[in-house]
Amino acid sequence: GAVIKVRTSFQEITDTGIRTSEGKVDCKIFVDARGVSSLVQKDRTGILSSAQYEIYADWIKKGKVEVIFDQEKYPGFFAWIIPSNEGKGKVGVAGKGINVAEALDSILKEKGKFSTIRKIYAPIWIKGPIEKFVEGKTVIIGDAAGQAKPTTAGGIFTSGMGGVYAGQ
């Protein structure tokens, strides 16, 4: 069986498993799912800041996705408005070297009245999958392996293929 630890910091790989902030864990395979933060050490140039708000707004129309390409405002990426229903959706922005909170607030101010359901600020990886995601008894998955698709927040296919290769 698997052991899943949350609110626990990985510290190092040992001969019999790993050491965490809560002590040693014996394991045959260590799955690294630490997210984009583990890529920071490898290559900062592949990381963009992003902000996304889930909101209610009369100007969000069901079935009307907006993608805003403006390399001056959102260098290296874009802004988006994705409805989840009539009057409800996700509005976001990502870019290199910008204040994403200010950029998103500017979009929302232009669009009109809204009420916020939740706010998410997160780094996103844009350079694709890492070259080596299986090393010894460590398997790196998901965002930590660059297996997510930043344009859709997806990554089922790339993560699934990673699992197939790891199994081999």
Whereabouts are the PLM-identified features?
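Predominantly flavin-linked oxidoreductase catalytic cores and closely associated redox partners
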Residues: 2-118, 125, 129-134, 146-148
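A generic short alpha-helical patch detector that favors 3-5-residue windows
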Residues: 133-136, 158
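Residue-level marker for buried hydrophobic side chains located in beta-strands
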Residues: 138-140
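Glycine-rich phosphate/pyrophosphate-binding beta-alpha loops
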Residues: 145-157
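An active-site-proximal "capping" alpha-helix that borders the catalytic cofactor pocket
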Residues: 155-168
